Amino acid sequence: YVILVYDIVTDDAGKKILPNVFKICKKYLTHIQHSVFEGNISTPKITALKNELKQFIRKDVDSVILFSSRDERWLKKEFIGLNDDKTSRFI
């Protein structure tokens, strides 16, 4: 189980990078809030995700953080403010 967050500087180059990073993350994980994704993902898919992201992330200004856990049940999800527990995979 992984939680991924990213921060892309929105300069001219970043505005072009941001949609690509979003699409890559959405391909592997569930979009839960702005630049936050979560989901169960295998080790080979984590490797593929990271390799795809490395093509776009500028090491000097952008960042991606992956939090990993063996199981989602080991995490407590708590909302402060809007409790929008919908995932983007549901229509």
Task: Identify what each model region corresponds to.
Residues Y1-I3, I8-I91:
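Basic nucleic-acid-binding interfaces
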